[in-house]
């Protein structure tokens, strides 16, 4: 743990997520002021005063609970300036501190009746239903006040523990119990709502149930066995994390810090607010109304209805739309609940925590780089100068080209030849990492040697495309620069594209020509029917070597699919190789000319090959020449 500039940094080994107990939820938000007053409970649905524009006390933006909205200034204005740091105002009870505490200080709402947590009730699988071994439909009937559940059957012969009863059935049993001739001494006890659910969960002895289930598993098969295993897994998790099942029923709900659900004033005096504030307001209003009804001893049916509405309000706050009607705001738009903020691609985890922008990284469209080696990639100069700027500045100063960082930055902005020369020296032997989302296996991020290129697109060797599952139809890739020597060494030794030939999943080669390469090879060697085949000996279409054809093509005297006669003394695979020549002509010098469909072979009197001309297309010559050239170099 380090302490510098009054900021404390904590280094953690891991983050553990588990169910919070009601006491822990209250501890998150509760603070004791120096005068002994305990603050933290949000009791009013108000946000800010529309005349003074200051937060209302005990409301959702209360300064006493969450901290001052202005740095070093209390609510009433008695204390201002940093010299009063840490003082709690006697008049308004606000601590004089920085306003940024409103980003992490929490509050809580003490509920007038317990409510079930919708994640554990309506999640897949429903942990409440699994633990209680009751169908989810029946659990919902209990929670949403449609059915009673027997908590204690007493002396009643027809009732069983956890049995569901409708309103009419319970009324009949009540009449039976309280009849004059009733023989029932130990009265049965029933419950309804989340309170009954909490009682059922409290009655569970997890260790005993786990033992019984393990014995039962040995004697069961098929579907029943799978169900028992599912239940014991949940129970074992509860035991391992020291969590109690009744914590799945909430007695208090946390109120997240106000700066994470802000309220901002727009032009014209109107306010824009986070959806969470509306959802919290619904919960507080219903909670306060329920508390008032309980105080005045309102009829049971009214109290029960209010409890159900409170349950629905908390459900909407935690996960709007998971159960029942979705709560909508203006324009019939569904309000964003806590779950909506957390989950999904645009959620807090994937968007803001895992998807953070990183220093020394860039992003651009990829295009094919056919002249690159497999371990190379083309990095745009504009991107390279930005990514390698600290290295370039260091070298410029070391070579006495400039004296300070400011002068170096000015020189870099001009991007003259001197800077480009230094940049070339810097990137020499400095690997970079290329990543294409989604990174589904380890080959989704590989190291390459950068080569400076013009334009604004990253050039990629087509052979590495299958590993990245990339194509050149607009895909984007991210560039990362490894800074430390260890990471550069690791990138070069382990992550270089030429070291990752085989797939880690199957062990088969992953560097195979695919997509653009296959299409390019096909286009290069394809035969176009609209091009006429020239006669043998036609000066315009006869060439002495493959190089001559390439030069003529580069000089734009030939098109890619044009037929040519080219002298080639190597082996030729021909479709009519097994048949006889179409014509054999004896020449004056004693040699003979064999005329095949796609070649002309000339032999001397001893049957030695003097020359061979092949009828082919320019594209096929380019293909052959490239392959022969690359093979001869290795």
From Swiss-Prot:
Catalytic activity field: RNA(n) + a ribonucleoside 5'-triphosphate = RNA(n+1) + diphosphate
* Top-rank taxon, per record: Bacteria
Per the record, the GO terms for biological process are: DNA-templated transcription
Give the EC class as a word: transferase
Q: Does the keyword ATP-binding apply?
A: no
Q: Where does Mg(2+) bind?
A: 471, 473, 475
Asked whether the UniProt record includes Cell membrane among its keywords, one would answer no
Q: Which GO terms describe its molecular function?
A: DNA binding; DNA-directed RNA polymerase activity; magnesium ion binding; zinc ion binding
Using the chain's own numbering, where are the disulfide bonds? Answer: none
Cofactor or coenzyme needed: Mg(2+); Zn(2+)
Q: What does the record's cofactor remark say about binding? A: Binds 1 Mg(2+) ion per subunit.
Provide the alphabetized UniProt keywords.
Answer: DNA-directed RNA polymerase, Magnesium, Metal-binding, Nucleotidyltransferase, Transcription, Transferase, Zinc
- InterPro entries found in the cross-reference section: DNA-dir_RpoC1_gamma, DNA-dir_RpoC_beta_prime, RNA_pol_asu, RNA_pol_N, RNA_pol_Rpb1_1, RNA_pol_Rpb1_3, RNA_pol_Rpb1_3_sf, RNA_pol_Rpb1_clamp_domain
User: Might you give the EC number(s) for this enzyme?
Assistant: 2.7.7.6
Gene Ontology terms, cellular component aspect? DNA-directed RNA polymerase complex
State where Zn(2+) binds.
Answer: 74, 76, 89, 92
> Which family, according to the similarity comment?
Belongs to the RNA polymerase beta' chain family. RpoC1 subfamily.
Function per UniProt: DNA-dependent RNA polymerase catalyzes the transcription of DNA into RNA using the four ribonucleoside triphosphates as substrates.
Subunit structure of this entry? In cyanobacteria the RNAP catalytic core is composed of 2 alpha, 1 beta, 1 beta', 1 gamma and 1 omega subunit. When a sigma factor is associated with the core the holoenzyme is formed, which can initiate transcription.
Q: Which protein, by its recorded name, is this?
A: DNA-directed RNA polymerase subunit gamma
Source organism: Prochlorococcus marinus (strain MIT 9312)
* Gene for this chain: rpoC1
């Amino acid at each position: 743990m380090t302490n510098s500039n009054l900021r404390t940094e904590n280094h953690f080994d891991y983050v553990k997520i588990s169910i919070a107990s009601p006491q822990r939820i209250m501890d998150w938000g509760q603070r004791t002021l120096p005068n002994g007053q305990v603050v933290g409970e949000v009791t009013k649905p108000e946000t800010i005063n529309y005349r003074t524009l200051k937060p209302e006390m005990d409301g959702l933006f209360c300064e006493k609970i969450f901290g001052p909205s202005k740095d070093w200034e209390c609510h009433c204005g008695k204390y201002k300036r940093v010299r009063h740091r840490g003082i709690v105002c006697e008049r308004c009870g606000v601590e004089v501190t920085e306003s940024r505490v409103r980003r992490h200080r929490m509050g809580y709402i003490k509920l007038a009746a317990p409510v079930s947590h919708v994640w554990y009730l309506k999640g897949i699988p429903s942990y409440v239903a699994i633990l209680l071994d009751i169908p989810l439909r029946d659990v919902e009937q209990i929670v949403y006040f449609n059915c009673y559940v027997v908590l204690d059957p007493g002396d009643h012969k027809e009732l069983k523990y956890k049995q569901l009863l409708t309103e009419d059935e319970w009324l009949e049993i009540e009449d039976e119990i309280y009849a004059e001739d009733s023989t029932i001494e130990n009265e049965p006890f029933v419950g309804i709502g989340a309170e009954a659910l909490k009682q059922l969960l409290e009655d569970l002895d997890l260790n005993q149930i786990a033992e019984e289930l393990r014995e039962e598993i040995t004697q069961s098969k098929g579907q029943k066995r799978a169900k028992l295993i599912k239940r014991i897994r949940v129970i074992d998790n509860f035991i391992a994390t020291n969590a109690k099942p009744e914590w799945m029923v909430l007695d208090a709900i946390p109120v997240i810090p106000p700066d994470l659900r802000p309220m901002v004033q727009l032009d014209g005096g109107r306010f824009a607010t986070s959806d969470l504030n509306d959802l919290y307001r619904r919960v507080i209003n219903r909670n306060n109304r329920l508390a008032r009804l309980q105080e005045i001893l309102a009829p049971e049916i009214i109290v029960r209805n209010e409890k159900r509405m409170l349950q629905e309000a908390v459900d909407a706050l935690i996960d709007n739309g998971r159960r029942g009607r979705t709560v909508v705001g203006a324009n019939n738009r569904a309000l964003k609940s806590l779950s909506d903020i957390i989950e999904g691609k645009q959620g807090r985890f994937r968007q803001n925590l895992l998807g953070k922008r990183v220093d020394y990284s860039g992003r651009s469209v990829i295009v094919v780089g056919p002249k690159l080696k497999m371990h190379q990639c083309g990095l745009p100069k504009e991107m390279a100068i930005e990514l390698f700027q600290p290295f370039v500045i260091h070298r410029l100063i070391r070579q006495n080209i400039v004296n300070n960082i400011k002068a170096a930055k000015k020189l870099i902005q001009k991007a003259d030849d001197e800077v480009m020369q230094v940049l070339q020296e810097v990137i020499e032997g400095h690997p970079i990492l290329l990543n294409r989302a989604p990174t589904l296996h380890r080959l989704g991020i590989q190291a390459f040697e950068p080569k400076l290129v013009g334009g604004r697109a990253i050039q990629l060797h087509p052979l590495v495309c299958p590993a990245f599952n990339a194509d050149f139809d607009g895909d984007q890739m991210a560039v990362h620069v490894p800074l430390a020597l260890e990471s550069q060494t690791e990138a070069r030794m382990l992550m270089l594209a030429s070291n990752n030939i085989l797939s880690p999943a199957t062990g088969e080669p992953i560097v195979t020509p695919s997509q653009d390469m296959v299409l390019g090879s096909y286009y290069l060697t394809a035969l176009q029917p609209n091009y006429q085949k020239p006669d043998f000996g036609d000066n315009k279409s006869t060439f002495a070597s493959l190089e001559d054809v390439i030069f003529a093509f580069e000089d734009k005297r030939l098109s890619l699919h044009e037929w040519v006669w080219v002298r080639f003394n190597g082996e030729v695979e021909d479709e009519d190789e097994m048949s006889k020549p179409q014509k054999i002509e004896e020449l004056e010098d004693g040699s003979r000319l064999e005329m095949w469909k796609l070649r002309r072979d000339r032999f001397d009197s001893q049957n030695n090959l003097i020359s061979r001309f092949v009828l082919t297309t320019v594209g096929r010559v380019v293909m052959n020449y490239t392959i022969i050239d690359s093979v001869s170099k290795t």
